[in-house]
UniProtKB/Swiss-Prot annotation:
Sites where the protein binds a divalent metal cation 3: C2, C6, C11, C16
Name of the molecule in the record: Metallothionein
Residue numbers spanned by region Alpha: 17-49
Record bears the keyword Transport: no
Record-level Gene Ontology MF annotations: metal ion binding
Upper taxonomic lineage: Eukaryota, Metazoa, Chordata, Craniata, Vertebrata
Positions annotated to bind a divalent metal cation 4: C20, C21, C31, C35
UniProt: a divalent metal cation 6 binding residues: C24, C28, C31, C48
Task performed by this protein: Metallothioneins have a high content of cysteine residues that bind various heavy metals.
Length: 49
């Protein structure tokens, strides 16, 4: 469970596309490109790699 590990911000993440940020809280699906991971890249947030 990645709850709380990601949050939506201005879409700056070039590696995030479409709904790759499935670990983000509800409401972030439409802002997947702006998914910013607070956890290390080694976390379960695949969209943050």
């Amino acid at each position: 469970s990645c709850a709380g590990s990601c949050k939506c911000k201005n879409c700056r993440c070039r590696s995030c596309r479409k709904s790759c940020c499935s670990c983000c809280p509800a409401g972030c699906n439409n802002c997947a490109k702006g998914c910013v991971c607070k956890e290390p890249a080694s976390s379960k947030c695949s969209c943050c790699h």
